[in-house]
A protein has these predicted regions:
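Beta->alpha loop/short-helix hinge microenvironment recognizer with preference
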Residues: 1-391
Length: 391
């Protein structure tokens, strides 16, 4: 049994046979190619030479795929730094929207359409209820992030939202929530349920949905109606997971959700010729960690289920935090609350400068003598990534 294996190791061993048996779609094949070849030299190399001692340093390029476990830290730090400019020193709430598992097959068959519908339903629910004077009576700001996995890499689409605890009323004055989340969870869940199922029904009526695998039966009008009726009868779940009092705590928390993938390397416990063992949370036992073993190709299937559609935007900003509003309205909110504006530490920095700032590593200095490292232009034999496989 092998220890300390990585997701890259798992893909190298099991993906070739998985591809032969299953004929995965192009964006799954591309993701697998990226993971298997990340930092191997397949995406090119950076070569530098010390001016003083002649020491040569070769760094293999990463794949930069948003599904690669080795490529998330740098984008995450850059994104968090950019968000600091729009974080107020006010309460924030982490609200989660989930859908019943009966919808999983039809959502998976129509990922782009029905993931978008999740964002539409969650955002319109928050906007509508926040503007109601019964709850807050203000325009709010929030960020929505789609996750499609549970701890065991099972299919579990849900939306995480980071909601600003306050907003601007009709007179453009700041209205505070009083330190508590301002919307009843039962009301959120009911409104979200109605909006999502209404959009699902509209897409079915307009013949815009596809039906694959276990979702094929929903092509039939009566089966689809039964599905809707069943989902309307169920109590949907929306809940506030965390509350943050102040800007710094929410900033530190954001990165846990923004650039997360279905599973990270540290959860892979072992791999054999036929199986993979990884750590999962057992929510039926107070969230205790336990080990789960699956066939290698099943691990690949589970991982690839969570590759988003091509060019799909997972992190979306709404209300006061939307692109068209945040420059003016967030400045106004900052002035009302007396908050100082954060000056980005990473904006317009080169990659080498960011590495030094984030990790205190100076890649421009020789590790042997401390001399200056200068780029060495690659010759025609240096490997480069194929154009059709670039991110």
């Amino acid at each position: 049994m092998e220890k300390s294996c990585t997701i890259q190791d798992v893909f190298e061993r099991f993906y070739p046979s998985y591809e032969k048996r299953n004929s995965p779609p192009a964006h799954h094949r591309k993701t697998a190619y990226h993971i298997m070849n990340c930092k191997t030299g397949a995406f090119g190399v950076n070569i530098s030479v010390c001016e003083d001692c002649g020491c040569i340093s070769i760094h293999n390029n990463s794949c930069r795929s948003r599904c690669c476990p080795m490529c998330q830290e740098f984008p995450k730090e850059k994104w968090i730094d950019a968000q600091k400019e729009n974080v107020l020193d006010a309460p924030y709430y982490h609200v989660v929207f989930t859908v019943p598992e009966e919808l999983n097959s039809i959502i998976y068959s129509n990922q782009k359409l029905l993931y978008d519908a999740l964002y539409h339903a969650a955002s319109s629910t928050l906007d509508e209820l926040a503007k109601d004077s019964k709850y807050l009576g203000a325009d709010i700001g929030y960020i929505c992030i789609l996750h499609t996995w549970g701890s065991a890499m099972n299919y579990h689409p849900h939306i995480h939202t980071i909601v600003l605890g306050g907003g601007l009323d009709k007179d453009s004055k700041w209205k505070d929530t009083g330190g508590k989340f301002f919307l009843p969870y039962g009301v959120i869940a009911k409104v979200f349920r109605g909006k999502y199922l209404c959009e699902l029904k509209s897409l079915w009526n307009d013949s815009k949905l596809e039906f694959h695998g276990t979702a094929e039966k929903y092509q039939n009008h009566y089966c689809f109606k039964e599905l809707l009726d069943e989902c309307y009868k169920k109590d949907w779940v929306a809940y506030c997971k965390e509350t943050f009092n102040g800007a710094q705590s929410v900033i530190n928390y954001l990165g846990k959700y923004t650039h997360r993938i279905a599973i990270s390397n540290h959860r892979i416990k072992s791999m054999t010729e036929a199986t993979v063992t990884y750590a999962v949370k057992d929510y039926k036992n107070k969230g205790q960690w336990k080990e789960k073993t699956v066939p290698g190709e099943e691990f690949i299937r589970r991982f690839l289920m969570h590759v988003p559609p091509k060019r799909f935007v997972r992190i979306r900003h709404y209300g006061l935090l939307s692109c068209r509003n945040k420059s003016k309205k967030m400045t106004h909110c900052r002035n009302l609350l007396g908050c100082k504006k954060y000056i980005s530490a990473l904006k317009n920095r080169s990659a080498t400068e960011m590495i030094k700032l984030l990790y205190n590593i100076d890649v421009c200095r020789c590790s042997s003598c401390g001399g200056k490292m200068v780029p060495h232009l690659p010759d025609k034999h240096t490997p480069s990534v194929l154009a059709h496989m670039r991110c």
